[in-house]
Structure formats: C-alpha cells, structure tokens
Amino acid sequence: MLIIELLKALFLGVVEGVTEWLPVSSTGHLILVQEFMKLNQSKSFVEMFNIVIQLGAIMAVIVIYFKRLNPFQPGKSAREIRLTWQLWLKVVIACIPSILIALPFDNWFEAHFNFMIPIAIALIFYGFVFIWVEKRNAHLKPQVTELASMSYKTAFLIGCFQVLSIVPGTSRSGATILGAIIIGTSRSVAADFTFFLAIPTMFGYSGLKAVKYFLDGNVLSLDQSLILLVASLTAFVVSLYVIRFLTDYVKRHDFTIFGKYRIVLGSLLILYWLVVHLF
C-alpha cells in the first residue's frame, strides 16, 4: 500500500536528516534501517533513493547559511564579499580530490563494500579514531579558529579526507570533521566547513546518481515520486534542527560520544550478522 511506503519514506527522511550531519554515516544508516524495514521498490530505485534524498538535507544548509554564503547579499561590505568568494574557492578546491579519486571508483566500492559487515567495520574503526583524536587534542589549541584564516592548502587536505567516505559506513561529515581537526582547525570551523563542502559534493553526487538512474532506462512512477518527495522534505525539515544542534553542541563538547556510538552500533551489527548467518 502507498500509505505504508510513504510512512517508511517519512521515517527514512528522519534518519537521513539526523545522520547526514552527525559523524555517524547517513548512507550506512539508511542501508541498515532498510535491512529491517525495506521499501517495496526496485533495487535500482532504492539505491538512487538513498543518495538523492540527501538533496533535502543539503537545502537546509543553503537556507540556514544563505546570507553567509551569498556574495551578492545586500549590505555586505567589500571585505565580506571578498571573504565569501574566498570561502567558495576553498570549497571548490576541497572538492578536487573527490572528483579525481572518489568518483572513478565509486561504483567499485559500492559493489564491494555496500554490505553490513564492511559498514560495521567502518563504523567501529572510525569510532576509535574519533576517540583517539579527541584524546590527542584534549590539551592542544586549534591553529585555525575562523574559516577566513583557513588556507587553501588546508581546504585541499580536508577534501582528501573526504575521499575516505567512499567506503560505506565511514560518514562524509565524519571524515571531513576528523580531517579538519587532525590538521588543526577548531571543532566549529570543522563543522561549518563540512556543511559548506556538502553543497557541491552532494548536489553533484546526487545529480549523477539520478542521471545514471534514468540513463539506465528507469522511470519514476507517481508513487515513487511521492516517496522521494516525502523523504526529501522530511530530511530537509529535520536537518534544519540537527544543523543548529550540532553547531551549538561543538562549542561546548567534543565528538567522543559519537565515536562511542559508532563502536556500539558497529559491534551490534556484527553480532546481528553472526546470529543470522551462523545460527
């Protein structure tokens, strides 16, 4: 029934809106949730759905930061306009590694790692990395405390870390936040740059997935269009709250709790897999 599918889409939109911005892997969570609550749709649609609903989450970034990201915003001084253009240049530079490395190998990684055990291992591994990085940085002062003072080299290096998220379960936001903190930015700068970098990265990735879906001869039925719309709108609304929560959270806390969450979730997934396949 369509109503059941729409309720599933609503729930998956909530999952996307929450996990896209927290360093816990949104795609990994969507895949895992659908292990227990599958959309009754074709495999090709579900694969496209898991990526394209990220557009809803991205629109939340644009809405929240529109004035900051718009170089043509009325009232901006010449310096503010220059800094806005410099920010966009840093974002473009940070996209280069993904274009050169991640894009050509995306299909291969999706085919070989888009399963429960690889996702669980990635969750656990980067969970420990988060805990280690936060312990290492506990008594260190960040070298970059404002986006305006971030160098183009730093932006490029953060983009290199983003490439790690090609492995399902890694988390795009988690990889860029980790990379930024390791390089020496504050948590606030790491989070903000992660939000901004998501705009071209996820628009491009979602667009490519959608184009590939249609080039493969698929079409969207009315029901599928509604499912995609409901999930995307839900992801947008939820993201508005989660982005504001995270920007406030990182001012007073570190990311250790997310590392612990990843380890617990990954361990439970491995246990579940063992029970299902061995007993």
Swiss-Prot record:
| Record keyword Magnesium present | no
Give the main EC class: hydrolase
Spans through the membrane? 45-65, 85-105, 113-133, 188-208, 226-246, 255-275
Sorted alphabetically, the Gene Ontology cellular component annotations on this record are: plasma membrane
Q: Which residues form a coiled coil?
A: none
* InterPro entries assigned to the protein according to its UniProt record, in alphabetical order: UppP (IPR003824)
Locations listed in the record: Cell membrane
Extra remark beyond the main annotation: Bacitracin is thought to be involved in the inhibition of peptidoglycan synthesis by sequestering undecaprenyl diphosphate, thereby reducing the pool of lipid carrier available.
- What does this protein's UniProt record list under function? Catalyzes the dephosphorylation of undecaprenyl diphosphate (UPP). Confers resistance to bacitracin.
Name used for this protein in its record: Undecaprenyl-diphosphatase
Organism the protein comes from = Streptococcus agalactiae serotype V (strain ATCC BAA-611 / 2603 V/R)
What lineage is this protein's organism placed in? Bacteria, Bacillati, Bacillota, Bacilli, Lactobacillales
Q: Which gene encodes it?
A: uppP
